[in-house]
């Protein structure tokens, strides 16, 4: 079965954040959205039913289920475990209304192509954060033997049988690496991916594919080897890794409010670059096993330079949240966005709250102010929306965030989590 909201139009929502609230307490980090999405696509090449533990209940995840279900998959949540059985799947044409809204729908191309010999989808959507071409995905699939053409806004892929190849990526794209991995797992022979992405989510997908009975080596390095074959496991259970961006956002929420937080079910190694910048801002961070504790000063120090980079560099998905943090820190901070060319839309909204900065091209120079002032702002994308929430927590008065439904694409009830830590956030439909 698919989730109830499939087919419903998006509802515009606002949230109201009361300012000057310290974030203090203990929270659990949910499963990683960016690990779950490609793994959901990979269930199409499983031999039997799959149980995904720690699977976040997010809009993007539910949209992926609303693509899988019409193709014939059976999907059902039991708590935070998602049960999927794709053995009865027969279709290879993705629902256009959903695939055009969801960038991760592109992950379905590789699995559908290898299973059915064809795949059809629209050009994918997602957050408006710059030009995110899918050419690396398509080039990789063509290197494996796929025939691909564009027709009336559709991507149409066909292949009798994919064959392993050596693929050199022009850029270490996470999505392209994942798509090629899934397609290559079912291809004839070995595929080697050079300049592969190294993100933890790549490692999680590789682990899942290995659990299905395929063989992927080198995940976490820049060279991946995928040995084509067939799935051998009749049933697979996999636990999704913790979401490093959720962890970073919650730590930033405590930091911007001068609070203290303990995070459980977090992987400290995955948030190393984020923790390093929070320490530079004056936070104390301790880690023990799968837990981390952050305590923040009353006012943060400047951060001399944040440059977004592919993993293990600083993640672009934390740039907006750190922009909000720097807006109220002492001194002058600099942020350089190297991954996307249009990811400063949140800056203009923060300016409405009193943030002081100059921006040119991919660089923002932020002069911290002592206080922001609550007002009406807009969430233009998922992470920008999270940044508005953090700014609202630290501001004087109330901050109303419009289009807040975008936040639900990557955070599982963020307002409830923060309210449990001392925030006062309410929803307004």
Spans of model-derived segments:
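Short, structured segments at the rim of ligand-binding sites
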Residues: 2-429
């Amino acid at each position: 079965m698919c989730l109830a909201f499939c087919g419903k139009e998006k509802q515009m929502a606002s949230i109201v954040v009361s300012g000057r609230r310290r974030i203090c307490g203990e929270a659990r980090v949910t499963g990683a959205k960016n690990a779950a999405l490609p793994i959901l696509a990979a269930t199409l090449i499983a031999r039997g039913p799959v149980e995904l533990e720690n699977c976040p209940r997010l809009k993007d995840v539910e949209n992926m289920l609303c693509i899988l279900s019409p193709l014939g998959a059976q999907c059902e949540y039991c708590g935070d475990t998602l049960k999927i059985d794709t053995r009865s799947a027969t279709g290879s044409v993705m629902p256009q209304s959903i695939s055009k809204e969801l960038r991760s729908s592109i992950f379905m191309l590789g699995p559908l192509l290898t299973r059915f010999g064809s795949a059809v989808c629209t050009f994918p959507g997602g957050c408006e954060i710059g030009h995110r071409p899918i050419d690396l995905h398509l080039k990789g699939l063509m290197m494996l033997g796929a025939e691909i053409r564009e027709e009336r806004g559709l991507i149409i892929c066909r292949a009798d049988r994919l064959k392993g190849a050596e693929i050199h990526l022009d850029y270490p794209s996470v999505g392209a690496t994942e798509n090629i991995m899934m397609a290559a797992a079912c291809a004839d022979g070995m595929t080697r991916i050079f300049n592969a992405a190294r993100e933890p989510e790549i490692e999680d997908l590789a682990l899942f594919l290995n659990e299905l009975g395929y063989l992927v080596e080198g995940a976490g390095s820049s060279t991946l080897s995928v040995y084509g074959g067939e799935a051998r496991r009749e049933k697979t259970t996999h636990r999704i890794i913790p979401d490093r961006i959720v962890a970073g956002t919650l730590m930033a929420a405590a930091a911007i409010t001068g609070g203290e937080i303990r995070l459980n079910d977090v992987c400290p190694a995955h948030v190393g670059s984020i923790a390093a910048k929070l320490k530079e801002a004056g936070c104390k961070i301790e880690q023990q096993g799968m837990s981390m504790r952050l305590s923040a000063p009353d006012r943060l120090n400047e951060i001399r330079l944040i440059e977004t980079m592919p993993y293990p560099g600083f993640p672009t998905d934390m740039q907006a949240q750190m922009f909000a943090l720097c807006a109220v820190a002492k001194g002058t901070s600099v942020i350089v966005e190297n991954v996307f060319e249009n990811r400063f839309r949140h800056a203009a909204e923060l300016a409405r709250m009193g943030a002081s900065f100059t921006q040119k091209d991919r660089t923002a120079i932020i002069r911290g102010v002592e206080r922001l002032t609550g007002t009406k702002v807009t969430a233009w994308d998922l992470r920008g929306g999270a940044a508005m929430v953090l700014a609202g927590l630290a501001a004087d008065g109330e901050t109303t965030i419009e289009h807040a439904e975008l936040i639900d694409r990557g955070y599982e009830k963020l307002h409830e989590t923060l309210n449990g830590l001392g925030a006062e956030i309410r929803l307004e439909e």
